[in-house]
Structure formats: structure tokens, C-alpha cells
């Protein structure tokens, strides 16, 4: 990725101070997604390392991972699989508890969403501490997926999430970094 593209993508992300609580700088990608050129460039850049590779499914983490993941699935001609909060999927699910900054939560996937051995890219808008991504990778592996990569538009490297995912043996692709929380 060129420095100019990285600059343009970073500039297209809106920062909202003190949301959802004081001291947090919320990185809002809806402005990036609302700009057709920025959105296309971000999706193209995220999938570039896997262009021409066999990718069976793209798994997106609720909610912004659905938007980005759907676009990536279209780009690589694969299926899309939603990973949702507990109780939001209508069919038989497999659930995984994961760690948040303050406590735990659960995510789910349909038990038949992945055929064992399928190659899957995990997608979300942002990686911070990596707790949700770690839970999603464990969940995908539990139902037989080979997680070939995890892609995020934004990395908050001070929080260590990308390093956590890499320590699980999953390559990480991010486009822009922001310091702090």
C-alpha cells in the first residue's frame, strides 16, 4: 500500500472523542464506507494478498464486519458467514465466550456455516485488544475452518490485538493505525 493511500484512508475515518465513554477516541469507519472511492480502495487493499487464492468463506464479526466482509466475499467470489452476538442467529449455533476489556461476552455461528477444511478470512472494521477476534478464530476452528487471515481496516497497536491474533498463527492485514484507545 502506498503512503498516499494509507493517508487518504486514515483521513476518511472520523474520530469521535469521548464515545462511548470519556477518554475513548471512537474511530468511525462509516465515513470511509460512505465514500465510494475510499470504500472500494479499502476493500481492494484488504484482499490484495489473497487475490487468486482459494478462499471458501469470509466470516464477518457483527456489525461492521458484515459490511466489509460482504464486500470482500463478493470480491474473492466466496460465501459470507456472519458471526453474531449470542441469541441473534435463528438456526442451531455453536457459541464461544470471549474476553472484553471489562468482563466477557459470547459470539455464535451457525453449526453448519463452514464445511470442515474450508479456507476462511475473518473480517472486522477494527482490532483493539483482540478479544473478539480471538474468540471468533477459536469459534471458526471449532467448526473446522482453516483461518487463513484476519483483516481489519483499523489497528490500535497500543492495545496489542493484532499481535494476539498473530500469536494464534493467523496472518493479520490492517490498513491504518491509530495510537491510543
Swiss-Prot record:
CDD domains: PRTases_typeI. PROSITE patterns: PUR_PYR_PR_TRANSFER. Keywords: Cytoplasm, Glycosyltransferase, Purine salvage, Transferase. It is found in: Cytoplasm. The keyword Hydrolase does not apply. It is an enzyme of class 2 (transferase). One of its GO terms (molecular function) is adenine phosphoribosyltransferase activity. GO terms for biological process: adenine salvage; AMP salvage; purine ribonucleoside salvage. GO terms for cellular component: cytoplasm. Pfam families: Pribosyltran. Its EC number is 2.4.2.7. Pathway: Purine metabolism; AMP biosynthesis via salvage pathway; AMP from adenine: step 1/1. Its main location: cytoplasm. It catalyses: AMP + diphosphate = 5-phospho-alpha-D-ribose 1-diphosphate + adenine. HAMAP family: Aden_phosphoribosyltr. Homodimer. Catalyzes a salvage reaction resulting in the formation of AMP, that is energically less costly than de novo synthesis. Belongs to the purine/pyrimidine phosphoribosyltransferase family. This is Adenine phosphoribosyltransferase.
Amino acid at each position: 500500500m502506498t503512503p498516499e493511500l494509507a493517508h487518504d484512508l486514515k483521513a476518511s475515518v472520523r474520530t469521535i472523542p469521548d464515545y462511548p465513554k470519556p477518554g475513548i477516541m471512537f474511530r468511525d469507519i462509516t465515513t470511509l464506507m460512505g465514500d465510494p472511492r475510499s470504500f472500494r480502495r479499502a476493500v481492494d487493499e484488504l484482499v490484495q494478498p489473497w487475490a487468486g487464492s482459494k478462499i471458501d468463506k469470509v466470516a464477518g464479526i457483527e456489525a461492521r464486519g458484515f459490511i466489509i466482509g460482504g464486500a470482500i466475499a463478493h470480491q474473492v467470489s466466496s460465501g459470507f458467514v456472519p458471526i453474531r452476538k449470542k441469541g441473534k442467529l435463528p438456526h442451531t449455533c455453536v457459541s464461544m465466550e470471549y474476553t472484553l476489556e471489562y468482563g466477557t461476552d459470547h459470539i455464535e455461528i451457525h453449526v453448519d456455516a463452514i464445511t470442515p477444511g474450508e479456507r476462511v478470512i475473518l473480517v472486522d472494521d477494527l482490532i483493539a485488544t483482540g478479544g473478539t477476534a480471538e474468540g471468533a478464530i477459536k469459534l471458526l476452528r471449532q467448526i473446522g475452518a482453516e483461518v487463513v487471515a484476519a483483516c481489519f481496516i483499523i489497528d490500535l497497536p497500543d492495545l496489542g490485538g493484532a499481535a494476539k491474533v498473530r500469536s494464534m498463527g493467523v496472518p493479520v492485514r490492517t490498513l491504518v493505525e491509530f495510537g491510543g484507545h
